[in-house]
Amino acid sequence: SQLPFDFDLASHANERLCAVGHLEVLQAEDIVVYDRGYFSYLLLHRHVQTGIHAIFRLQQNSSSAIQAFFASPQTDIEITLLPSLPTQAEIRSQYPDLEILPLKLRLLKYRIADSVFCLGATLLDAERYPLHEFIDVYHGRWGIEELYKVSKRIFVIEDFHSKTERGVNKEIFAHFVLVTLNRLFSNRADMEINSGQPFTSQNPAMDRPSLKTNFKNCIHVLERGMEELLFLHQRIKAVVQRVFRTICTRHQRVRPNRSYIRRSMRPETK
C-alpha cells in the first residue's frame, strides 16, 4: 500500500533503537525490510520474540558466519547465530534482562549486474519463501528512498517553521498525513488505469501493473484541490472526483530494472 505506519522524532541518532520502537505498532507475521546497517543480534532477537518477520540487507562484516557465506558459492542456507562472549557481555550490560539464545537466521545471496546482495531473513521455509521472491521484496524497499526524495524536494520536510519539539512533531505528522492522502488517491488511480473496470479491492499490488500513477504529479494535483477539500464541505464529493480523475491522467509506464544514475536538476533547498 506504501502507506506510512509510524514515525519517531528522537534526540539520539540510533536508528536501530527507533526500529525496535516501530515494532510496537506491528503484529505477528508482519514483515519488515531493512537496509544495510540495521542488522544486530538485539534487533533479530526482538523480531523472534514478537513473531514479526525481518529481512535484513547484511554487510560482510556482520559476523564470521555471514562473512564466510559471502565468500562461499552457496546462495541459500540456514545458520544459528550466537554472539561472541565479548558481545554477549556488552549486550548484558545494556539489557540485563535479555535472555541470550542461539537464533536461527536464513542467509540468501544473489547478484544483480555487478552488485552482490546478501540478505538475512527470519522466513526460514525455503519452499514457501523461495529466493526469487526475496529479490522482488527487497527491490520494493526502493520506494522508501523515493519517498525520502519526495519529502525533501517537494514537501521540503526539513524546512521546519516551528522552534519547539512539539511543533516539529506536528509538522512531521502533517507531512505523513499528506503522504497518506496522496497515496490513497494514487493507489486507487493505479487500480483504475490498469484494470479499466470498477475496482472492488483496496489492494493495488495484486499484480505488477504496466502503468503507474506519477506520484509527484499526484501531489501537485491534490495541492491545487486541497483548499476546496478543507473548506467547501458541500462540494467535497465533486472535488474528490475531479481530483481523482485528474490524477488518473498523470501516469507513466512502469520501467523495470532501471539502473542508470538519477540526477535531479532541481536546485537544493537552503
Where is each model-derived feature located?
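Single, function-defining residue in the core of a domain
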Residues: 1-270
